[in-house]
Regions:
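Hydrophobic alpha-helical segments
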Residues: 1-193
Length: 193
């Protein structure tokens, strides 16, 4: 269900910002950006802060790894907007489109390390079933992933399980490939602020 709030209801300064974004990028403002600017005191500011910390804060996971986690969680959730956005960002971050495509097509045969594979497998189960157990954690830890890396991956999962559900509930418009590539470039340069 597409909500009209994504098209209107913004303060004059925000409307000006959106106009400038469209002017300089020659792309429509993504609905994800529109959502965080609508009632920033209620959702937007907190969501941006949490997501930025999960995706760009200190971590043993690279930015590319975390973007791939976001794309993988979004794939499990079947969130078209988020899959496209974070696949584009992971492709640019890794500078390796085939690697990203391989992970999203078949995690078990994809060219990634055991630790990342085990972590993605755990995030996929958590996303699909809403729970993981001690065996899941043992598998991740035995693949060489630290407890802090698990916590960091869970933060990515939390951010994009939330965002993906909002994207689908609000009917986020799927951008053109050029729009997603421009968004990915922005996210890699500026993060989620």
């Amino acid at each position: 269900m597409r909500l009209e709030i994504l098209n209107s209801g913004y303060r004059p300064g925000t409307k000006l910002l959106f106009a400038l974004i469209q002017l300089f990028s020659r792309q429509p403002v993504p609905d994800a950006a529109k959502l965080v600017f609508y009632r920033p005191d209620f959702y937007g500011s907190r969501a941006k802060q949490f997501t930025h910390e999960a995706m760009r804060g200190p971590s043993a996971w690279s930015v590319a790894d975390r973007e791939l986690m976001a794309a993988y969680v979004s794939t499990v959730n079947e969130s078209a907007f988020c899959v496209a956005a974070h696949s584009a960002t992971a492709r640019q971050a890794y500078q390796n489109g085939p690697k990203v495509a391989a992970v999203l097509a078949d995690l078990e045969t994809a060219p990634v390390g055991d630790g990342l594979r085990a972590t993605l497998r755990m995030l996929g189960r958590l996303t699909k079933e809403g729970k993981v157990d001690a065996d899941d954690m043992r598998q991740v830890l035995s693949a060489g992933v630290t407890r802090q890396q698990v916590a960091d991956a869970l933060a990515v999962s939390a951010a994009f399980n939330t965002t993906g559900r909002l994207a689908d509930a609000f009917g986020f418009a799927v951008l053109s490939p050029e729009g997603f590539e421009a968004g990915a470039k922005y996210l890699l340069k500026r993060g989620y602020r």
